């Protein structure tokens, strides 16, 4: 791989923002100093006036650029998805390049409620793609199984209840085999009861993250599930999931997830799914250390001429603003997002640096820019890495999610001006990709 030297950038570290140089050798961050004079003709990135950040890790992303992780590639001409191996892999490649442009260095591709045979075929195509030797395969960190084990149609959101299945270890095993062992996150709403708790324990022991969302469960059911290993709230405050202010049954999912220090909260940060004032409220109540920003991006992201679509029995539409999706005929039911991570990061920086009236908190003070950068970087990079167990080095791999010596050089170089984060370089394990060439 050789050497890469990033010069005079503003480094967003773990606990401070400072100007310095970053030297990368064989894909690993080897030195971080105020000024590095390196012999041996390394590749040099001049980053004066730009930020050096850990790459974004999106743990909840269904697709982009016409690609859907469950159904393949959307054909605008026919209005149908092509799930053939060729179409799936071509669509995946386009989506991954769009993620690179947005500053993503790890993505967990997320599935919808769908026929099991459909998921097995798609996961098989993904497995074959990941087994080939190419830089894009480094970007994918497995699968988030969101829709398969949903239970209550009232809480379906934009998922099709026709394809909800009872929790079953055999189903998980079959999907795990089809994917080549790529399942990283599985959503098990606690209302499945003892069968769900048993599977939660099993998955936790296997190192798979167990999430809860789209859920009718009460707080006491969530408390039990959290005790068994559930530690992720699926797109918190969306889904929907039950909230209960009464004194019975320890509230609902919202209350249980806020109260537990074991649980990370996903937040879709497009400004539509969750009002910015609530985003500030959640960060203040939970602490930024347990919040993970996600896109929940759908295949429609980047499709300029798409207006309406069907996704395995569900009718959707692109809002006239082209900034979000909704279930056709139901303006209040959102259908994933068209958000890119760099835009989400810019949104969060803007919200954190503004004084804002809250709902659970009367007011939120404007943070200094450097404090906002540290918090946002944690929520987009460090926290998802910690959730997935890849923040620290070990078991033959280098950690990721922060700009530190000894970590994998999964980094971005970016310009932040006028509330817009523009990515100039994305580094995957030290290999430099200029976004203008993608």
Residue ranges and their predicted role:
Residues 1-53:
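Histidine-rich, glycine-flanked metal-binding segment
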Residues 5, 55-57, 211-212, 293-294, ...:
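Residue-level marker for buried hydrophobic side chains located in beta-strands
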Residues 50-118:
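Metal-associated gating/positioning segment near the N- to mid-region
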Residues 71-88, 97-106, 153-179, 224-264, ...:
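Active-site gating loops and adjacent loop-to-helix segments of metal-dependent hydrolytic enzymes
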Residues 123-146, 153-217:
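Metal-dependent enolase-superfamily TIM-barrel catalytic cores that perform enediolate-based chemistry
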Residues 145, 233, 348:
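Conserved, mostly hydrophobic/aromatic
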Residues 176-305:
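Active-site core of metal-dependent hydrolases
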Residues 250-265, 284-295, 301-411:
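His/Asp/Glu-enriched, well-ordered alpha-helical/loop segment
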């Amino acid at each position: 791989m050789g050497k890469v030297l990033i010069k005079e950038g503003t480094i967003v570290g773990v606990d401070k923002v400072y100007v310095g140089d970053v030297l990368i050798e064989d894909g690993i961050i080897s030195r971080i100093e105020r000024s590095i004079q390196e012999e041996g003709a390394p590749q040099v990135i001049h980053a004066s006036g730009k930020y050096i950040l850990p790459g974004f890790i999106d743990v909840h992303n269904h697709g982009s650029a016409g690609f859907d992780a469950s159904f393949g590639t959307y054909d605008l001409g026919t209005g149908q998805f092509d799930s053939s191996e060729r179409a799936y892999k071509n669509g995946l490649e386009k989506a991954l390049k769009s993620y690179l442009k947005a500053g993503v260095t790890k993505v967990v591709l997320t599935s919808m409620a769908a026929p099991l045979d459909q998921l097995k075929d798609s996961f098989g195509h993904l497995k074959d793609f990941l087994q080939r030797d190419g830089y894009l395969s480094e970007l994918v960190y497995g699968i988030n199984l969101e829709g398969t084990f949903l239970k209550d149609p009232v809480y379906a959101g934009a998922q099709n209840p026709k394809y909800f299945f009872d929790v079953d270890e055999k189903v998980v095993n079959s999907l795990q085999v089809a994917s080549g062992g790529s399942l990283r996150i599985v959503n098990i709403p606690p209302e499945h009861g003892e069968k769900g708790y048993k599977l939660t324990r099993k998955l936790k022991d296997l190192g798979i993250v167990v999430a809860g969302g789209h859920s009718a469960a009460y707080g006491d059911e969530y408390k039990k599930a959290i005790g068994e290993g559930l530690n992720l709230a699926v797109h918190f405050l969306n889904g929907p999931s039950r909230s209960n202010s009464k004194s019975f049954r320890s509230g609902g999912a919202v209350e249980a997830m806020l109260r537990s220090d074991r649980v990370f909260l996903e937040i879709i940060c497009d400004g539509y799914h969750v009002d910015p004032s609530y985003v500030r409220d959640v960060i203040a109540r939970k602490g930024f250390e347990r919040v993970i920003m996600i896109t929940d991006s759908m295949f429609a992201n980047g499709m300029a001429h798409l207006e309406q679509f069907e996704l395995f029995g569900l009718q959707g539409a692109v809002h006239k603003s082209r900034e979000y999706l909704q279930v056709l005929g139901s303006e209040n039911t959102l259908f994933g997002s068209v958000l890119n991570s760099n835009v989400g990061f810019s949104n969060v920086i803007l919200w954190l640096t503004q004084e804002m009236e809250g709902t659970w908190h009367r007011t939120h003070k404007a943070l200094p820019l450097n404090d906002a950068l540290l918090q946002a970087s944690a929520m987009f990079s460090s926290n998802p890495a910690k959730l997935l167990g890849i923040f620290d080095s070990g078991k033959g791999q280098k950690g990721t999610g922060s700009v530190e010596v000894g970590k994998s050089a999964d980094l971005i170089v970016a310009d932040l001006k006028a509330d817009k984060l523009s990515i100039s370089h994305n580094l995957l394990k030290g290999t430099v990709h200029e976004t203008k060439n993608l």
